[in-house]
Amino acid sequence: MLHSSYSKYILDFNKPSWTSRGVLIQKETYFIRVVDAAKPFLVGIGECSVFRGLGADDVPDYEKKLAEVCWNIEEYKDCYKEKLKEYPSIIFGLETAFADLENEAKMTPFPSDFTEGKGFIKINGLIWMDSQEEMKKQIDAKIDAGFSCVKMKIGALDFDSEVELLRSLRKRYSKEKLQLRVDANGAFSVDE
């Protein structure tokens, strides 16, 4: 039989992070703990990360739903992906907690070179919204770290400044050297 509980934490950002909908200085997150009564010394842990104002599961009853899931973990264990479609962060937290438990609760639910510190996932270097100068510094740091693709969060600066930043990057780095991606995060209306 499984037992589950959760804890809420408020995480303070080291540096304010700009989004198209404002500046984040902190965020709330929840850690789910899942224990199998047959092995009570093993605790699977998963994180349910909520970005208020940005995520699909930013709803008023979020914590109430999480408490219900933890209280009734046996009812959810085999069908949580179907029952919790409106709560993707809870799905992620449960999936990670169950995988961690299956992996003897070593806090590496999906062992790999990445989780062992021997490699990294080379998808793209994420560039947070900031002043043009700070974004250029972030991009240079990502390129120095070996990234050939950067994804820029845009929408916090005025449109012309962001276009100018992209143009200046393209002048400095060819498309063969650097792939540019943008993430507007709802910065523009449908009409724009």
Model-inferred region functions:
Residues 1-180, 185-187:
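N-terminal capping/lid subdomain adjacent to the active-site entrance of alpha/beta enzymes
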Residues 188-192:
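Catalytic cores of alpha/beta
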